[in-house]
Amino acid sequence: MDFKFIQKILPRLYSMLPFYFAPRSSFPPIQAFFEVTYRCNLRCDMCHYLEIIEDTETNKTFKNELSADEIKKAIAKLPRFSLITFTGGEAFMKSDFMEILEFAVKNHKVHIITNGTTLSEKVVEDLLNLRLKSVWGCGLFYMGVSIEGGEKLHDTITTIPGSFKKTTQGLERLIARKQELKSKFPLIHLTCVINRGNVMDLVPLYKYAN
């Protein structure tokens, strides 16, 4: 089964059918994005949230973020089997993120975008315990991990020395454990902000992804 095709065509059909058959109505949303925190342990120089992240950490404004209970109430209003994307900041910097995640996977497919630096053995194990078992079910469906280029360039972009090693170690830890379990899910994709500064590193990054 071609999941990329399904992922592409179904949302399009879902949004277009009411347009043709019932123009004054629409189906409930099937995908929702939650920026659960603006805390982050990296400072990527191209990040458009950089000022917000700095303010969040410096002035402790993360204390004003939605609580786990508030986010769970919003999730509970979504149609069953919706696709929920969690991002930040760095989602795993939110202290109660796992509580939110455990609630979300009960009735939905979940996608997480992360920089991968916090994927310890325990976190990986907890995530795989929440993984999707069948494409027709609920659970952790997708994981997106951010890598901006080779080691030197990645660390320059994130402005944090050693961040590339932490990210790749976390990613490879996740892949290895997934293989041990002989699990198809979660599917894994790499994310990269392409610009003039890292375009020459894309071929090595592509080879690494393969």
Predicted regions and their residues:
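Conserved AdoMet/S-adenosylmethionine-binding subsite of the radical SAM
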Residues: 94-210
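Conserved alpha-helical substructure of the radical SAM core
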Residues: 2-133, 138-141
